[in-house]
Regions:
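N-terminal leader/targeting and assembly helices and adjacent pre-domain segments
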Residues: 1-161
């Protein structure tokens, strides 16, 4: 097997690094959304404590507890839905852009480094969509995101109930 010229190895590595950097930059929107929702939970818990603390302990009747848990469950589900939609939209955009960019950049590097005339067709939208929605480990990424959000809601709710 022929050894790949170091110059082309570096170009291909740079394509990957550029894609990673783009993804990291674009995910900042998702991270901010997650932070905003975390702050909202902290405020909710703080207000709950301020309204119901007696001698430094949270004191609620069983009726109040049921209302609090119902309200908490509703808030957490709304937050998870918001975070899931934000993440899916952002990740979809990142995957589509990176798939397209890396295809064309790699095609250029390969075409410039090989003495054979290669033909790289224009990448059709349906090919990009198929690649983005291709299952990984039996699941498409959006299903994995929704499952992760459901798990987070369950763990946060349980953590608050246990506290």
């Amino acid at each position: 097997m022929a050894k790949l010229n170091q110059q082309y190895q570096n170009l291909i590595l740079q394509i990957k690094q550029d894609a990673d950097k783009f993804a990291d930059q674009q995910m900042q929107t998702v991270y901010k959304n997650q932070k905003d929702n975390l702050d909202e939970i902290h405020k909710y818990i703080g207000m709950l404590y301020i309204k119901n603390a007696v001698d430094g302990l949270l004191k609620v009747t069983p009726y109040q507890k049921n209302n609090i848990l119902s309200d908490l469950n509703s808030k957490l589900k709304d937050m998870a839905k918001d975070m899931g939609n934000t993440e899916i939209n952002q990740v979809t955009d990142i995957l589509k852009k990176n798939y397209s960019d890396t295809y064309y950049k790699n095609a250029y590097v390969m075409d410039s480094g090989i003495n054979v005339n290669l033909k790289f067709d224009i990448l059709k939208k349906e090919y990009i969509d198929a690649a983005v929605n291709n299952p990984l480990d039996g699941q498409i990424f959006s299903n994995r995101i929704w499952q992760n959000k459901a798990t987070v809601v369950d763990k946060v709710k349980q953590g608050i109930v246990d506290a």
